[in-house]
Amino acid sequence: MSRIILFGGHGHVARLATPLLVQAGHTVTSIIRNPDQVAALVELGAEPVVADLEKLTIEGFGGLIDGHDTIAWAAGAGSGSPSRAWAIDRDAAVYSVQAALIGDVRRYLMVSWSGSRIDHRIAQTDDFFPYSQAKAIADSVIRDSGLDYTIVAPGRLTNDPASGGVERA
């Protein structure tokens, strides 16, 4: 089974995925920023590690991913803060790809969004621009990396029951 490092471990997607991964026999190391979230992740079956993605270097990411065979990126700042979107959705994601290439990790799963492409047509004046541009850049780096990758590009995320409908691009 895989040894997965899951960035953004306390986010909604990660909290739904973690028990499924653990039940399937995978080991999940869950990277979180807030130490108050450790107990909740232990309860889900993850091995939590507290780290601030905005402060990690490529070497810092390398230390975290060492011993894992898969990176799952579910971290994201969203559109609330432009500086955090650039720092997490672009810089930290790209650093994790670079660390994977230096280390032994060859599989990468990115949770992105359905409009993630360089020609996304989001106006630079739109509050969503930094997030959309950061995601587009990170996804492009992943595609060009040579890693065995999957980019999951959902539209709207909801708490509705799973429909089972997934389209492959």
Give the role of each language-model region.
Residues 3-26:
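N-terminal Rossmann NAD(P)H-binding glycine-rich loop of SDR-like oxidoreductase domains
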Residues 5, 29, 49, 150:
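Conserved beta-strand positions in the Rossmann-like core of class I SAM-dependent methyltransferases
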